[in-house]
Amino acid sequence: MLDPKFLRNELAVTAERLATRGFILDVAHLTQLEEKRKSLQVATEELQAARNAISKSIGQAKARGEDVDAIMAQVGDLGSQVDAKKLELAAVLEEVNAIAMSMPNLPDESAPIGADETQNVEVRRWGTPRSFDFPIKDHIDLGEGLNGLDFKSAVKITGSRFIVMKGQIARLNRALGQFMLDLHTTEHGYTEAYVPLLVNEASLLGTGQLPKFGEDLFHTKPATEEGQGLSLIPTAEVPLTNLVRDSIVDEDELPIKLTAHTACFRSEAGSYGKDTRGLIRQHQFDKVELVQLVKPEDSMAALETLTNHAETVLQRLGLPYRTVVLCTGDMGFGSSKTYDIEVWLPGQNTYREISSCSNMKDFQARRMQARYRVKADNKPALLHTLNGSGLAVGRTLVAILENYQNADGSVTIPEALRSYMGGLTQIG
């Protein structure tokens, strides 16, 4: 949520910056609503003052033995007018709030201006894609050939865009999540958290999934009242970031760095027909999430650090990747600046996103009222929040299967994972 004061005082600037994201702000309508709000506010306060002044005269009139029925009627009439104005004001404020909740974050000045993903800017590459001297397979053929990926059973049990993993591939998938958690907690300074996979509406509003992206979520309909309105998490960013909702942390506690390995659930409502085969776009997938809560002056540096933490996973696994900074038209709703990390997939002969690392600045914190107490003046100030995948486990599995495949259909296990696989060096 944007700063209301900045929005009111810099409406034209806000509209101009939001336009670079493809969001057209109706300045005229918002200005009209603001004028109406001011007018109703003044009218309400004047009526309240008049009612209070007349109310005081009732006691005086009674003391003089005068009839107060007319005065009482006048007070009642003014009270009705106050109530009516309050209702009008509440309706205007509700509309203003709905508009404010629909606005994406303002892009950082360092984010390149562009309309879509074709105008994202590559900032670096790591590793060289492997040259194969045999016909390569994609992860689907490799996984099915190794009896480790069972798409048919998943369709029978649930439906499309789900997977059943078996044997050593299931073990490899588990090893990846454990490896990522160990790296981030022992070397990068994150605290591991175990979090609920079901969250309430307030949590989703806080991190920005609601109200805009409700159709992308899976919502529960329990038989009992307890649990009504819960939704499956689309990312562990939601529960991790909401740990500081409606709270004030001490400045000495910052930065707070959290990580969790969870299943994530997305309906993929807007991606019909995209990546219909394989593990790239699933309704249920595992992800290791990284969240940082920092002071405002530290957030841009924290974004670089967090992105590096995600990149380190790929480097340790020996997987080629590139990092791009997203243009304004391709950034997520709550982000002010985002880096996407894209891993090389030989089966698709291209780089595909495996992590998205974003600085939300105070956008989420304002929604959540997540603050810290500034030591200098002992006053609360909004935190800056950051998040990123460290990494998407399923897509990392895809990258390993395709990059480490052998001519006979077997897959070599990266050295960094062998201790998690009981010393196994190859699957198949």
UniProtKB/Swiss-Prot annotation:
The protein's UniProt keywords, in alphabetical order, are: Aminoacyl-tRNA synthetase, ATP-binding, Cytoplasm, Ligase, Nucleotide-binding, Protein biosynthesis
According to the record, the signal peptide region is: none
Q: Which positions in this protein are listed as binding L-serine?
A: T235, A236, E237, E289, S389
Q: In which pathway does it act?
A: Aminoacyl-tRNA biosynthesis; selenocysteinyl-tRNA(Sec) biosynthesis; L-seryl-tRNA(Sec) from L-serine and tRNA(Sec): step 1/1
| InterPro entries tied to this protein | aa-tRNA-synt_IIb, aa-tRNA-synth_II, aa-tRNA-synth_II/BPL/LPL, Ser-tRNA-ligase_type_1, Ser-tRNA-synth_1_N, SerRS_1_N_sf, SerRS_core, tRNA-bd_arm
Keyword Nucleotide-binding listed: yes
* Gene Ontology terms for molecular function: ATP binding; serine-tRNA ligase activity
Task: Tell me what reaction this enzyme catalyses.
Answer: tRNA(Ser) + L-serine + ATP = L-seryl-tRNA(Ser) + AMP + diphosphate + H(+); tRNA(Sec) + L-serine + ATP = L-seryl-tRNA(Sec) + AMP + diphosphate + H(+)
Q: Which family does the UniProt entry place this protein in? A: Belongs to the class-II aminoacyl-tRNA synthetase family. Type-1 seryl-tRNA synthetase subfamily.
Its biological purpose: Catalyzes the attachment of serine to tRNA(Ser). Is also able to aminoacylate tRNA(Sec) with serine, to form the misacylated tRNA L-seryl-tRNA(Sec), which will be further converted into selenocysteinyl-tRNA(Sec).
Q: What is this protein called?
A: Serine--tRNA ligase
Q: Which organism is it from?
A: Shewanella sp. (strain W3-18-1)
